[in-house]
């Protein structure tokens, strides 16, 4: 059980809820804050004080006063009119993350919603009823209005949901799950949609996958080092301590562990004095990606525990302030940074692929072909990797430098953070395929060298991946191999590190 209190949610907690399907519940203390904040909203409505979002219109209509009897209609109309998302739906895990993150944000007690609304979000989450939320349509300020409106639709029994593997009308899913729709009252519609939970949900899923992929790239790069008889001296601790970046030091340490008893690596001067940068500089390049991942994680964990609603209610309602916490600029920057960092893992991996298949750069069979000339072997795999890498370069263009004014120029600067997060997720997917291609080529190279000479760790890795992709004995449709191994990388852990006592205590 993950307990939500509005301030302590971590990426590890999110992973447990999203992928291990642990249930989530609100702490008693946070629910008390919610009730106090709600009482303040009800006083404002009763006393007919003019407060944005409670008894006024929205955006450009903020100066239009709404009568008390129209309060519920105001919130419903907001959700209906703002549900303008288009395109394919977010993956269910992202929809699931939105439910979790919105509940956690509301539990801070600054938004004035009823406890029943948070209970509805958690009921959807725990019973695995996932709103169908189109991916396109958010500007990233005022928060993720369109995506979160589709989330809100499901809570009130409208729109669509995924339930038990099927897409269906929301009311059908609610009945099957035993959930009653809620009716939104004062401020609740705005509190649901005025936030950054779509970009942050997409961002945290991207981060979780990127972190796993970063570890996987090191292990597969270790196989490549063996396949190319790489020089192990480049990973000597003294080199990396001399520079001082902890992440670089950690990558080098892990590579040394993976290759500690390898009979395929060489020493400087044995075959060559130096290796190419794509081998020699793995700690420097991969380490820089880890630096970025640390930055991204820090910003995500702040945002996951942030109040991003507007207005916010303080001091039991004595202080109600309109501000701009819904602006997604911090996450937009973080996601753009993540795109760049993961793209670099693909860039350097593609160069290692080239070194594995190019006969001018190694002493392996040309293109790792069992019968060069008659059979092309891995030749076009490098083309596929090059295409994916080039696509990443386009996707890595920063979304956060763009802005288009909206709402009659009232909302005249926006973050495009959700676009950045969506593109980051695609960059990760592309990079995973590049890494799968490197793995296929590295497996073949190590097999040619003699798997019996490989390190204990990489030998185990080799055996696991050979269950997914067989040896290349003749040309075949390699697309199937790439997709199978890509799927395996996404779903499986590569020899869980916690089972290796030698790695305990290392920064893994």
Swiss-Prot record:
Enzyme Commission (EC) number: 4.3.1.3
Cross-link (5-imidazolinone (Ala-Gly)): 141-143
GO molecular function terms attached to this record: histidine ammonia-lyase activity
BP GO annotations: L-histidine catabolic process; L-histidine catabolic process to glutamate and formamide; L-histidine catabolic process to glutamate and formate
SUPFAM superfamilies recorded: L-aspartase-like
Induction statement: By histidine.
Top-level taxon in the UniProt lineage: Bacteria
This protein's record includes keyword Repeat: no
Pathway: Amino-acid degradation; L-histidine degradation into L-glutamate; N-formimidoyl-L-glutamate from L-histidine: step 1/3
Subcellular location field: Cytoplasm
This protein's UniProt keywords: Cytoplasm, Histidine metabolism, Lyase
Keyword Isomerase among UniProt keywords: no
Disulphide-bridged cysteine pairs: none
A GO CC annotation given for this chain: cytoplasm
PROSITE patterns: PAL_HISTIDASE
Post-translational modification as stated in the protein's UniProt record: Contains an active site 4-methylidene-imidazol-5-one (MIO), which is formed autocatalytically by cyclization and dehydration of residues Ala-Ser-Gly.
Catalytic activity: L-histidine = trans-urocanate + NH4(+)
Catalytic class of the enzyme: lyase
Protein name per its UniProtKB record: Histidine ammonia-lyase
Source species: Bacillus subtilis (strain 168)
Lineage of the organism: Bacteria, Bacillati, Bacillota, Bacilli, Bacillales
Gene name as annotated: hutH
């Amino acid at each position: 059980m993950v307990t939500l209190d509005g301030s302590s949610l971590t990426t590890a907690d999110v992973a447990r809820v999203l992928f291990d399907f642990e249930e989530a519940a609100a702490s008693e203390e946070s629910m008390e804050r919610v009730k106090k904040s709600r009482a303040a909203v009800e006083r404002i409505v009763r006393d007919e004080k003019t407060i944005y979002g409670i008894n006024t219109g929205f955006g450009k209509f903020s100066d239009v006063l709404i009568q008390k009897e129209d309060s519920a209609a105001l919130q419903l109309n907001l959700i209906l009119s703002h549900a303008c998302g288009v395109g394919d739906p977010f993956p269910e895990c992202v929809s699931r993350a939105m439910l979790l993150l919105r509940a956690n944000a509301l539990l801070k007690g600054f938004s004035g919603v009823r406890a029943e609304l948070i209970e509805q979000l958690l009921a959807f989450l725990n019973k695995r009823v996932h709103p169908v939320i189109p991916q396109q349509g958010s500007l990233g300020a005022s928060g993720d209005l369109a995506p979160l409106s589709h989330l809100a639709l499901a809570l009130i029994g409208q729109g669509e949901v995924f339930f038990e593997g099927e897409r269906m009308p929301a009311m059908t899913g609610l009945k099957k799950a035993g959930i009653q729709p809620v009716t939104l009252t004062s401020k609740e519609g705005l509190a649901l949609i005025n936030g950054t939970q779509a970009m942050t949900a997409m961002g945290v899923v991207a981060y979780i996958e990127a972190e796993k992929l970063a570890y996987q790239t090191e292990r597969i790069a270790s196989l490549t080092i063996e396949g190319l008889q790489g020089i192990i001296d480049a990973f000597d601790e003294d080199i990396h301590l001399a520079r001082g970046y902890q992440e670089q030091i950690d990558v080098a340490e892990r590579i040394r562990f993976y290759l500690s008893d390898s009979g395929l690596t060489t020493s400087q001067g044995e075959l060559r004095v130096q290796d190419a940068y794509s081998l020699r500089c793995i700690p420097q390049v991969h380490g820089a990606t880890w630096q970025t991942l640390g930055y991204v994680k820090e910003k995500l964990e702040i945002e996951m525990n942030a109040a991003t609603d507007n207005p916010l209610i303080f001091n039991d309602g004595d202080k109600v302030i309109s501000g701009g916490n819904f602006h997604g600029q911090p996450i937009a920057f973080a996601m753009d940074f993540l795109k760049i960092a993961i793209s670099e893992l693909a860039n350097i991996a593609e160069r290692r692929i080239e070194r594995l298949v190019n006969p001018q750069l190694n002493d392996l069979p040309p293109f790792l072909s069992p019968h060069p000339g008659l059979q092309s072997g891995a030749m076009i795999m490098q083309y596929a990797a090059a295409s994916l890498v080039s696509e990443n370069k386009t996707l890595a263009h920063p979304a956060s430098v763009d802005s288009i004014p909206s709402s009659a120029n009232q909302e005249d600067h926006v973050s495009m953070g959700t676009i950045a997060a969506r593109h980051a997720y695609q960059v990760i997917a592309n990079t995973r395929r590049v890494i799968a291609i490197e793995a296929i080529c590295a497996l073949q190279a190590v097999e040619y060298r003699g798997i019996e000479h490989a390190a204990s760790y990489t030998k185990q890795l080799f055996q696991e991946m050979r269950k997914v992709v067989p040896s290349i004995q003749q040309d075949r449709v390699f697309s199937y191999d790439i997709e199978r191994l890509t799927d395996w990388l996404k779903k499986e852990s590569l020899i869980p590190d916690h089972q290796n006592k030698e790695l305990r205590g290392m920064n893994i």
